[in-house]
Amino acid sequence: MLERATRTIKTAGLLLAAYFVLNIVLRIVLPHSLELDEAEQSFFSQYLLAGYGPQPPFYNWMQYAVVSVTGISIGALIVPKNILLFLSYLFYGLAGRRVLKDEALAAVGMLALITLPQVSYMAQQDLTHTTALLFASSLFLYGFFRTLDRPDMASYLLLGLATGIGLISKYNFALMPVVALIAILPDAEWRRRALDWRMLAAITVALVIVLPHAVWLQGNLAFASSDTLVKMAAGSEPAGAVRIGKGLLAFLVAIIAFAALPVVIFAATFRRDFVRALSAGNRWTGMMERMMLASLAGIALIVLFTGSTTVRERWLDPFLLVLPIYFLAKMQAAGLDLSAGLRRFRPVLPVLMACVLIALGFRVVGAGLIGTYSRPNVPMAGFAREMTRQAEPALVIASDTYIGGNMRLQFPDVPVVIPDFPAPGIPAYAEAKGPVLIVWRGKKTATAADAVMPERFSSALTAAGIALQEIGSLSLPYYFGRQGDNFALGYAWVRPETR
């Protein structure tokens, strides 16, 4: 059965489609309290802007388009994400077919993406912008490999489309076309692909996609880069050898964490064939090696020049995504009979799928057993119900996008704002035609007394001339939580007649 499912990209795609449908069903069955990125998308989907903050806007634009048609719901947040992930696998398989020239092997390579934890588990858990990056990276690999294999206008346009989408998905994607160019320089035939006049069409497509955000970025560069720089520079070490050493060590650990599972699985299933293939190669494996080495060298230089002490595995997504195709191409180049290894490898794939689904479910329903709570465990529906027993809000002012996005899901017909977004201050307050509900978050495991308003939020309300009345706080038990483990929210009402 598994052999039939991996015979072609189409049959493997059907297996993947069923898997992603199960992921959608699982998330809909779990509590509808949102993860951090889900909440951000819920909140930002009220606006169509050229830029939203530290992350590029591709996913926000896609989410805005979906919500504009369907309205806000858990399905409107989850289904598009799973479609993007499905397309990531599909384009990866199509890229693999260009390299491997064997559709059955390409189908296995497509499914082998699930051996990368950053793709299979972390992207499902949250990470909306990383999901967009995975999609763009797979599309880029397909466009790039297709252009190298059999160039035509469609392949160049696809390459430009992928580059444009990638650049407005995650800023680290900017390294991808650079390392791709470096990787083909030693090959005279492939070098001509980069000098082909059709490359101008690819560049034009990419520029058209990027231009609106690039114009916004020009005036908001500090704002857009602040979050990334803070994450990269986290650490208390002064500048110098110790800081550089810590950064390079973090980089090495990230590489190992990213690549360890696929290396172990391929080595365990293909055994000696995997080891023997390490010394084999062809022009495709050489090109992929140069891509990976150039990208890792680029990241190492960034670590050195910025003094970064933090490198996260997901930052390596576009650069090491090619690993499963690379491993299969190496073994194919060695001229080995892979049938025995493939028989051992195929059963691993549904096992990993099941493990991902179980882990995603257990982290929520088993939270009380392990004592660590995820954001879906927070009883947002209960908070919304308790806060609005006496009145329905005409406007919700939230302390941050996490609270704002959850409130938007609970009150889909009510505008939700946070201070200083999308305009300075809270201009929506003056325009509200009814009661205004103000909400802020307390501590994770808390009593109602712990729902103290953040000082920054308090200052923003004061600056906007908002005087709070009817201040309250709530502490409700987590979904699937231990007795006594609560989450706290603070809230206040401002009535029209008292403003």
UniProtKB/Swiss-Prot annotation:
It holds the Pfam family PMT_2. Its main location: membrane. Pathway: Bacterial outer membrane biogenesis; LPS core biosynthesis. Disruption phenotype: Cells lacking this gene produce a normal lipid A structure with GalA at the 4'-position but a modified LPS core structure as this gene deletion results in the complete absence of GalA on both the 4- and 5-positions of the outer Kdo residue and incomplete addition of GalA to the Man residue. The mutant cells are also more susceptible to deoxycholic acid when compared with the parent strain, and more resistant to the polycationic antimicrobial peptide PmxB. It is found in: Cell inner membrane. One of its GO terms (cellular component) is plasma membrane. One of its GO terms (molecular function) is galactosyltransferase activity. It is an enzyme of class 2 (transferase). The chain crosses the membrane at residues 11-31, 74-94, 103-123, 125-145, 165-185, 199-219, 248-268, 291-311, 316-336, 351-371. GO terms for biological process: lipopolysaccharide biosynthetic process; lipopolysaccharide core region biosynthetic process. Its EC number is 2.4.1.-. Keywords: Cell inner membrane, Cell membrane, Glycosyltransferase, Lipopolysaccharide biosynthesis, Membrane, Transferase, Transmembrane, Transmembrane helix. It is a multi-pass membrane protein. The keyword Transmembrane helix applies. The keyword Transferase applies. Belongs to the glycosyltransferase 83 family. Involved in the modification of the lipopolysaccharide (LPS) inner core. Catalyzes the transfer of a galacturonic acid (GalA) residue to the 4-position of the outer Kdo (3-deoxy-D-manno-octulosonic acid) residue of the LPS inner core, using dodecaprenyl phosphate-GalA as the donor substrate. GalA addition by RgtA is required for RgtB activity. This is Lipopolysaccharide core galacturonosyltransferase RgtA. It comes from Rhizobium johnstonii (strain DSM 114642 / LMG 32736 / 3841) (Rhizobium leguminosarum bv. viciae). The gene is rgtA.
